Amino acid sequence: MPSKKKKYNARFPPARIKKIMQTDEEIGKVAAAVPVIISRALELFLESLLKKACQVTQSRNAKTMTTSHLKQCIELEQQFDFLKDLVASVPDMQGDGEDNHMDGDKGPRRGRKSGSSGRKNGGMGSKGKDKKLSGTDSEQEDESEDTDSDGEEETPQVPPQASHPPAHFQSPPTPFMPFTSTLPVPPAPPGASAPDAEEEEDYDS
């Protein structure tokens, strides 16, 4: 069965936009088309910002877009000047290839840490969220698809073997000893067996 590709829903919900607009006391009624137009404008803005940031990321030969890439993009593009205050505290870009967190070849890739995540004793994994906190059913399905696809898409790199052979520790085999209880079995109450015999006779007759 082929793995189904996740469809990304990059739409900003107009109903949520309308609620945000109505939190302002000066805004009265809102026409139905207004939140839809704002939603589309947000999509186009993000598309533009991310394309420019992607170009910056690729120019640095990095595999992961970071906040430093976004900061450089915002500083280079005049149309994003209004965002400069937001990225003022973000550290500047370092030299080419010096950023360890940008190069995928340096260091192990993000994978599951042994013992820190995943399901233990039937518990939720680290990506599991409380259904009350999650927004809609489609978001919950998307989250479950994320957890399914994470295992397929990402394969952690195996670190290179050291020059020393791995040490194998063996303990001497222990002889098989059947488990026997050392506690004495309490005797049955003396009056309990006699009524049972009488009840069985009643059922037979």
Swiss-Prot record:
Biased composition (Basic and acidic residues): 98-108
Listed GO biological process terms: transcription by RNA polymerase II
Keyword ATP-binding appears in the UniProt entry: no
One Pfam entry name: CBFD_NFYB_HMF
Domain called Histone-fold: residue spans: 14-77
UniProt cross-references to InterPro entries, sorted A to Z: CBFA_NFYB_domain (IPR003958), Histone-fold (IPR009072), Transcr_DNA_Rep_Reg (IPR050568)
GO molecular function: core promoter sequence-specific DNA binding; protein heterodimerization activity; RNA polymerase II general transcription initiation factor activity
UniProt biased composition (Acidic residues): 138-155, 196-205
A GO cellular component entry from the record: nucleus
Source taxon at top rank: Eukaryota
Keyword list, A-Z: DNA-binding, Nucleus, Phosphoprotein, Repressor, Transcription, Transcription regulation
Modifications made to the protein after synthesis: Phosphorylation reduces DNA binding, but has no effect on heterodimerization and TBP binding.
Alphabetical list of SUPFAM superfamilies matching this protein: Histone-fold (SSF47113)
Subcellular location per the Swiss-Prot or TrEMBL entry: Nucleus
Sequence segments annotated as region (Disordered): 91-205
Function (record text): The association of the DR1/DRAP1 heterodimer with TBP results in a functional repression of both activated and basal transcription of class II genes. This interaction precludes the formation of a transcription-competent complex by inhibiting the association of TFIIA and/or TFIIB with TBP. Can bind to DNA on its own.
Family: Belongs to the NC2 alpha/DRAP1 family.
Cited PANTHER family: DR1-ASSOCIATED COREPRESSOR (PTHR10252:SF5), HISTONE-LIKE TRANSCRIPTION FACTOR CCAAT-RELATED (PTHR10252)
Subunit structure: Heterodimer with DR1. Binds BTAF1.
Protein name: Dr1-associated corepressor
